[in-house]
């Protein structure tokens, strides 16, 4: 029996990124594989006709490539941390229906998926927690979730497409709180400069009737701007389209590689990595 998703619901907002990850898998099979997304889309009763029609457009295909690179980059950083901290907590912040934690599983780490209660309720049905895995129904901005994480073996946190919807002060408070709670841990996430965030925000800000786009989190020079928040933070960043992969694959056109350079350099689309405290 298929799981029915209605239009204009919270569940629908989770289905579209899932569809995008399925599209990535089909368009760029040498660069990205998300078998969970392919399987889940097949198990869901939802009218994908509009998404399928849009998937033929040039910008939708480039958007799918962006999603693929972002997920690959974050997974790379999680796996790099697990090489030196094999029993670490792997924490997906704002997880939706993303299964990156399980994809990075080394057989010893502890996996946590954190999101709002209504999101986790859907996740429990479609992606029930497996061995060494917990789904945590919490608001990311509420530090009460810190106590749910067993960081005795270290902790690596990642957030995909999440902080664009946070005020700068909210990101700063979260990062400083995590530095207190998880010394030796690492947080990785995607970010972009003010110009890019304004473009990302166009639609949802209009519907939310929010005027001050400038208050939302954006960053150009992450080591300088975020490093100033707290002396305990070790901050680095890499372009998220070309910082981890040269995209010299037959599935990626020269025009898309040009757009990738514009994204990394002009829009400062980047993966930011923050190390907390002294313990490594």
Regions found by a protein language model. Give the residues of each.
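Short amphipathic alpha-helix with an adjacent loop that forms part of the alpha/beta core around
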Residues: 143-152
């Amino acid at each position: 029996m298929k799981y029915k998703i209605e239009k204009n619901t919270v569940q629908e907002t989770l289905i579209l990124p899932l569809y995008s990850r399925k599209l990535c898998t089909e368009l760029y099979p040498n660069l990205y594989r998300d078998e969970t997304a392919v399987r889940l889309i097949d198990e869901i009763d939802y009218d994908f006709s509009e998404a399928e029609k849009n998937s033929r457009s040039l910008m939708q295909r480039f958007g799918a490539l962006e999603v693929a690179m972002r997920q690959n980059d974050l997974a790379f950083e999680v796996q790099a941390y697990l090489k030196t901290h094999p029993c670490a907590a792997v924490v997906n912040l704002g997880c939706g229906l993303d299964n990156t934690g399980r994809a990075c599983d080394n057989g010893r780490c502890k996996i946590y998926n954190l999101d709002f209660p209504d999101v986790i309720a859907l996740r429990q049905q479609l992606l029930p927690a497996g061995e060494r895995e917990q789904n945590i129904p919490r608001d990311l901005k509420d530090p009460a979730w810190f106590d749910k994480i067993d960081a005795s073996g270290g902790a690596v946190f990642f957030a995909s497409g999440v902080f664009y919807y946070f005020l700068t002060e909210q990101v700063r408070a979260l990062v400083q709180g995590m530095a207190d709670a998880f010394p030796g841990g690492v947080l990785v996430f995607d970010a972009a400069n003010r110009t890019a965030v304004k473009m990302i925000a166009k639609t949802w800000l209009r519907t939310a009737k929010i005027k001050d786009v400038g208050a939302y989190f954006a960053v150009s020079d992450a080591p300088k701007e975020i490093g100033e928040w707290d002396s305990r933070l070790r901050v680095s960043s890499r372009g998220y389209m070309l910082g981890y992969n040269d995209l010299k694959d037959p599935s990626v056109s020269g025009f898309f590689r040009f757009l990738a350079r514009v994204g990394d350099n002009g829009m400062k689309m980047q993966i930011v990595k923050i190390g907390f405290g002294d313990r490594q």
